[in-house]
């Protein structure tokens, strides 16, 4: 059964995730404790052997091997390999979940398209939705061990009511070397076409909509089957597994406490006459390697996460509840196309019939939310310039072929030492203000403000020419 803790993390609070660490079902402790105990036992055996059973010469050789293993373990890019692999597995896991076929859309279309309150109409609707559920049961039998244990043979499928004996005989008479989960979908299409000929489906548009929804449903069944068929390449899984196991095999030897290497002590101060040098100091003798055990817990746990969700249709604690999905889909779909068909509550005026702005009430616990202003956009409270000239509308002239003028920034020009824009700026490139004469002060770059005198003179000439053109009828 899927482990759900959504309610426990509904609010961010102190120690919110810490409370989840005490759970056992679906936890990393349940997945990893055997490997963790094995790693600790092997580490203890090697430590006891080094401390009690080896001679001084053998200890020296062992220390050399341990230092070599410790250096070699750091050469394995474990975080890089595991990160990519777990990301791939998690994306695949979620895609498999979204590929589980649900009949909700299809049952609504059946209820709206297949008409008739008599026994024939009821039979058509129930049979169509039963065929859809049968297709999902057949494909889930092929990919989920839980469903296969529930329906080990086709006789169990018949006894569960998803298929009749005649349908089973017809199904088994079809000879094919491939999985036949698609057969109920073909029965569905043939029965829908017959309902159209009989007038139960009133037009071709409704039939087309019904078949489109069926194809979406069948596509999910097919995708689920192909996810089970095409796995993540085995070589990738092998590389990741070998990398993790190799890292901790080297760590078993390399992380052991050994005597410090000669000359490894830090440089000491000058000794006084008669003072003996201090012995070489190494790492403290940790009988329990806490950091190594934590590293094993993180990396091996990371690999266990991928191992659990790489196939979510098994029987682990966090695998998909396929049997409950089958029960839910059958019950809901039959209810919608049979008992709920044309079974409507009376249409009545709603509570806010005469109100222009309906406002549902709040409880005391949520009343403060009603005082918050509604979100109108990130730029709603942006302060605009008080200068009215900045809000004047102008028309661009894309046919001019000349570059648009740059805005004059006197303050920036003082700091950067830049002059006025290029003399190639023409007043004809500026659009006219809609409904008003062109204000020359918007385009004039005066020489006394730090601009180019030659550019200012040219702008004055073009301003005069444009003014003459505006006066002509």
Swiss-Prot record:
Record's compositionally biased regions (Basic and acidic residues) = 445-461
Q: Which reaction does it catalyse?
A: chloride(in) = chloride(out); hydrogencarbonate(in) = hydrogencarbonate(out)
Transmembrane stretches, start-end: 32-51, 61-82, 238-255, 290-303
| Molecular function GO labels | bicarbonate channel activity; chloride channel activity; intracellularly calcium-gated chloride channel activity; metal ion binding
Chief subcellular location: membrane
Pfam families (alphabetical): Bestrophin
Annotated region described as Disordered, given as residue ranges: 379-408, 428-473
Give yes or no: UniProt keyword Transport.
Answer: yes
Provide the residue positions that the database annotates as binding Ca(2+): 10, 308, 311, 316, 319
- Give a short account of what the protein does: Ligand-gated anion channel that allows the movement of anions across cell membranes when activated by Calcium (Ca2+). Mediates the movement of hydrogencarbonate and chloride.
Tell me what this protein is called.
Bestrophin-4
Species source reads Homo sapiens
């Amino acid at each position: 059964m899927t482990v759900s803790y959504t309610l426990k993390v509904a609010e961010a609070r102190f120690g919110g995730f810490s409370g989840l660490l005490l759970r056992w079902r679906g936890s990393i402790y349940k997945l990893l404790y055997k490997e963790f105990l094995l790693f600790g036992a092997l580490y203890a055996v090697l430590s006891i052997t080094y401390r009690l059973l080896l001679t001084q010469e053998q200890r020296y050789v062992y220390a050399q091997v341990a230092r070599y293993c410790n250096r070699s373990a750091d050469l394995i890019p474990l975080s890089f390999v595991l990160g990519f692999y777990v990301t791939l597995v998690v994306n695949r896991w979620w895609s498999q979940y979204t590929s589980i076929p649900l009949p909700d859309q299809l049952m609504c279309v059946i209820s709206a398209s297949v008409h008739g309150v008599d026994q024939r109409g009821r039979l058509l609707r129930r049979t169509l939705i039963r065929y859809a559920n049968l297709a999902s049961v057949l494909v889930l039998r092929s990919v989920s061990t839980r469903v296969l244990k529930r329906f080990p043979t086709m006789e169990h499928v018949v006894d569960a009511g998803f298929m009749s004996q005649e349908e089973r005989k017809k199904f088994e008479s079809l000879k094919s070397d491939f999985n036949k989960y698609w057969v109920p979908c073909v029965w569905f299409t043939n029965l829908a076409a017959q309902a159209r000929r009989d007038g139960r489906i009133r037009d071709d548009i409704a039939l087309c909509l019904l078949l489109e929804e069926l194809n979406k449903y069948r596509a999910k069944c097919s995708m689920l089957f192909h996810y089970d068929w095409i796995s993540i390449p085995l070589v990738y899984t092998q590389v990741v597994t070998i990398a993790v196991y190799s890292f901790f095999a080297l760590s078993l030897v390399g992380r052991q406490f050994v005597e410090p290497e000669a000359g490894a002590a830090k440089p000491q101060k000058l000794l006084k006459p008669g003072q003996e040098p201090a012995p070489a100091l190494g790492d403290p003798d940790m009988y329990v390697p806490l950091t190594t055990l934590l590293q094993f817990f993180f990396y091996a746990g990371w690999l266990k996460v991928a191992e659990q969700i790489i196939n979510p249709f098994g029987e682990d604690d966090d695998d998909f509840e396929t049997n409950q999905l089958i029960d839910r889909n059958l019950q809901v779909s039959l209810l919608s196309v049979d008992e709920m068909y044309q079974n409507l509550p009376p249409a009545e005026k709603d509570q806010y019939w005469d109100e222009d702005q309906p406002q549902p009430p709040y409880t005391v616990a949520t009343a403060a939310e009603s005082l918050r202003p509604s979100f109108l956009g990130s730029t709603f409270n942006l302060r605009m310039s008080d200068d009215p000239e900045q809000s004047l509308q102008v028309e661009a002239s894309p046919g001019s072929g000349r570059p648009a003028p740059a805005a004059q920034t006197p303050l920036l020009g003082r700091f950067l030492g830049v002059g006025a824009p290029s003399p190639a700026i023409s007043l004809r490139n500026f659009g006219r203000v809609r409904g008003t004469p062109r204000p020359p002060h918007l385009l004039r770059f005066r020489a006394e403000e730090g601009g180019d005198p030659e550019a200012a003179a040219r702008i004055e000439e073009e301003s005069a020419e444009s003014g003459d053109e505006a006066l002509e009828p």
